[in-house]
Amino acid sequence: MGLLALLWGSTFLWIELALRALSPLQVTVARCLLGAGTLLVLCLVTRRRLPRGRAVWGHVFVAAFWCNALPFALFSLGQRTVGSGLAGVLNATTPLWSMLLGLALGTERGLRPVRAGGLLLGFAGVVVIFAPWQGAGQAGWGALAIVAAAASYAVGFAYMGRHLVGRGHATLSLSSAQLLAATVLTGLSLPLGGRPPAHNAPAGLIAVVILGIFATGITFHLTYRIIAAEGATNAATVGYLLPVVSLVLGFVVLDEPFSPRAAAGMVIVLVGVGMTRRRSPGDAGPPAPPVDAPAEAPTRSGSEEHPGQIVR
């Protein structure tokens, strides 16, 4: 999980640099394309096959929209006015959205006072960062886009855990297929504003390559493995670690300012997220299933299949 936090936390730095060379939608398409290409090569090397069947691909495209295409585009759009460090802080709200979604779907039970307080405290921290009383203007809209991206991640994680994980497909096959689907979806958006000529910024183009291969392809596969092993809510808690990485990289590499208000908001958000992760012994779920599934694992009948359980 530490490696995933490091790779995911650096995403905001690479987006910031990539936007110096490409438009937001170009960055979105490029990272999906490079990420998909990276994982497809790994599939060839490991002899993994992509999932088959219309039903599976239907779920793949839905998950790709919520977990890849939409949040990737929102991050690129939001970071035109929001620094990489603050973007990482706002992305840390993903566990809060996952908890809200779990409550709505009935998968989160036993909302004790401390967890409810953490939920409220976390969103209070977001309000402090937004500072609507100061009239944030464009920066406020950018921050709103990033918060929406964090919420979209939560929806995507939950959908993946319910409809894709534990169906007899290797996580590498699923992550490859999902980024391939995201490439198709984001490619369709290029006529909406993603076709201006790229700027001649070598550092930005290098950042796009790193963003696509490592911060998208490898990172997304690791995310899928955690969802398979520990569930969607636990996968979302990686966001708890991202602000430290994004803030340090933003400050050291990009010399981004870090205001006292943003610092206070970050602390409030992280304390709130930490409170929501506190569980009593009775809240513990079933043991985690294996991390990966065989490429050709047989599946049981529909009545015996359980979402979130890897088919052995």
Describe the predicted segments one by one:
Residues L39, S98-L100, A104, G135-G194, ...:
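Transmembrane alpha-helical segments that form core, pore/gating elements
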Residues A21-L70, T93-G102, S152-Y159, S175-G194, ...:
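Transmembrane alpha-helices of multi-pass small-molecule transport proteins
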Residues L39, L100-L101, L111-P132, A150, ...:
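Hydrophobic transmembrane alpha-helices of multi-pass small-molecule transport proteins
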Residues T11-L22, L34, F72-V82, L90, ...:
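Juxtamembrane C-cap of transmembrane helices in multi-pass membrane transport proteins
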Residues R20-V29, R52-G58, A116, A131-V155, ...:
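Juxtamembrane helix-entry segments on the extracytoplasmic side of multipass membrane proteins
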Residues L7, T11-I15, L40-N91, V126-I129, ...:
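Specific transmembrane alpha-helical segments of multi-pass solute transporters/efflux pumps
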Residues V29-A30, N68, A87-T93, Y159-T183, ...:
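Helix-helix packing/entry segments at the starts of transmembrane helices
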Residues Q26-G37, W66-C67, F72-G110, V114, ...:
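Specific alpha-helical transmembrane segments that line the substrate/conduction pathway
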